[in-house]
Amino acid sequence: MQVLTKRYPKNCLLTVMDRYSAVVRNMEQVVMIPSLLRDVQLSGPGGSVQDGAPDLYTYFTMLKSICVEVDHGLLPREEWQAKVAGNETSEAENDAAETEEAEEDRISEELDLEAQFHLHFCSLHHILTHLTRKAQEVTRKYQEMTGQVL
Amino acid sequence: MMQICDTYNQKHSLFNAMNRFIGAVNNMDQTVMVPSLLRDVPLSEPEIDEVSVEVGGSGGCLEERTTPAPSPGSANESFFAPSRDMYSHYVLLKSIRNDIEWGVLHQPSSPPAGSEESTWKPKDILVGLSHLESADAGEEDLEQQFHYHLRGLHTVLSKLTRKANILTNRYKQEIGFSNWGH
């Protein structure tokens, strides 16, 4: 696996995006049969399995779909909303989307551009770092299950 | 093996949004030779900007302010002044460009002055996210959060890019205006 880290400084958001993209691609290459990941949980730090945590297959599809946005840019708003509505059609989710938008407006009003920038920039950085680690865990778990541990 | 760079050539990619912003700030940086000329000049919105080109008093302000570029210390003071003039916008835009180019994590964050007025500071976000990482709750909506912040960053970047362009144009106008008088 080759990660492009030389073009940008280590902490740059673009480096983090590159790394995420590469790790997810690697995961996709390793996981030949994604359905094997169904109903498999990631074990916690102490080997405990958390109740109600999503299974690895859920992670796998989520990580892949986020990777599309990392690589190709933002989905148009309508497309994103259609996607969310398609995945979860419950009323609660729609309400959640509405409150999220209200929340968004509220934040935009409260914060100046600098604070907004830092909020989104730092959050993206952390979410991507976290997701990169998740992708690595999914890959490793799959390799364990299929006996490919190197 | 990984052809990551190619995929960045998409119109809406974050990479392009950042590059546009960095380009606009670089352009501003090159245009504004004497940043202190921007002190006390209000940054108008584009609508107002187009109508009132002959901003009253700013020409006189230019003649008075012929001091060389200020020291970094004085820059910090005006940067967090409650009412922002063009100069503080100039400093802000450059500092955000540096954050994009070099990352923000290892920089000493929020300055003492003005930090109490905003409840959302990078530190809070760090705490919030480390909490998120340890807790099982919130895992499912990571995708939503990611999308939300990506969209937010796009919006902010396009606003900032516009601001940098307005500032560059205003500076050119100011310079042109003062030359016109002589």
From Swiss-Prot, chain A:
GO molecular function, one term: molecular function inhibitor activity
Source organism (scientific name): Mus musculus (Mouse)
Modified-residue entries (Phosphoserine), positions: 90
Pfam families to which the protein is assigned, alphabetical: Spot_14
Role played: Plays a role in the regulation of lipogenesis, especially in lactating mammary gland. Important for the biosynthesis of triglycerides with medium-length fatty acid chains. May modulate lipogenesis by interacting with MID1IP1 and preventing its interaction with ACACA. May function as transcriptional coactivator. May modulate the transcription factor activity of THRB.
Assembly mode: Homodimer. Heterodimer with MID1IP1. Interacts with THRB and PLAGL1.
Compartment list: Nucleus; Cytoplasm
GO biological process: lipid metabolic process; regulation of lipid biosynthetic process; regulation of triglyceride biosynthetic process; response to bacterium
Biased composition (Acidic residues): 90-104
Residue ranges crossing the lipid bilayer per the database entry: none
KW NAD (keyword) present: no
Residue ranges, annotated region (Disordered): 83-104
The protein's name in its UniProt record: Thyroid hormone-inducible hepatic protein
Keywords: Cytoplasm, Lipid biosynthesis, Lipid metabolism, Nucleus, Phosphoprotein, Transcription, Transcription regulation
Family: Belongs to the SPOT14 family.
Tissue expression: Mainly expressed in tissues that synthesize triglycerides.
Knockout-associated phenotype: Decreased lipid synthesis in the lactating mammary gland. Milk has reduced triglyceride content, causing reduced weight gain in nursing pups. Adults exhibit reduced body fat content. No effect on lipid synthesis in liver. No effect on the expression of thyroid hormone-induced lipogenic genes.
Primary localization: nucleus
From Swiss-Prot, chain B:
Region (Disordered): 55-75
Entry's Gene Ontology molecular function annotations: enzyme activator activity; identical protein binding; ligase regulator activity
Residue numbers carrying Phosphoserine: 71, 74, 78
Keyword Transmembrane recorded: no
Induction / repression: Down-regulated by fasting. Up-regulated by a carbohydrate-rich diet.
Protein location: Nucleus; Cytoplasm; Cytoplasm, Cytoskeleton
GO BP terms: lipid metabolic process; negative regulation of microtubule depolymerization; positive regulation of fatty acid biosynthetic process; positive regulation of ligase activity; protein polymerization; regulation of lipid biosynthetic process
Tissue specificity statement from the Swiss-Prot or TrEMBL entry: During embryonic development, expressed mainly in the neuroepithelial midline, urogenital apparatus and digits. Detected in adult white fat, liver, heart, brain and kidney. Expressed at very low levels in lactating mammary gland.
InterPro entries in the cross-refs: Lipogen_MT_Stabilize_sf, Spot_14
UniProt keyword annotations, A-Z: Acetylation, Cytoplasm, Cytoskeleton, Lipid biosynthesis, Lipid metabolism, Microtubule, Nucleus, Phosphoprotein
Record GO cellular component, one term: protein-containing complex
Family, per entry: Belongs to the SPOT14 family.
Subunit and interaction comment: Homodimer in the absence of THRSP. Heterodimer with THRSP. The homodimer interacts with ACACA and ACACB. Promotes polymerization of Acetyl-CoA carboxylase to form complexes that contain MID1IP1 and ACACA and/or ACACB. Interaction with THRSP interferes with ACACA binding.
Task performed by this protein: Plays a role in the regulation of lipogenesis in liver. Up-regulates ACACA enzyme activity. Required for efficient lipid biosynthesis, including triacylglycerol, diacylglycerol and phospholipid. Involved in stabilization of microtubules.
Protein name, as recorded: Mid1-interacting protein 1
Lineage: Eukaryota, Metazoa, Chordata, Craniata, Vertebrata
Gene from which the chain derives: Mid1ip1
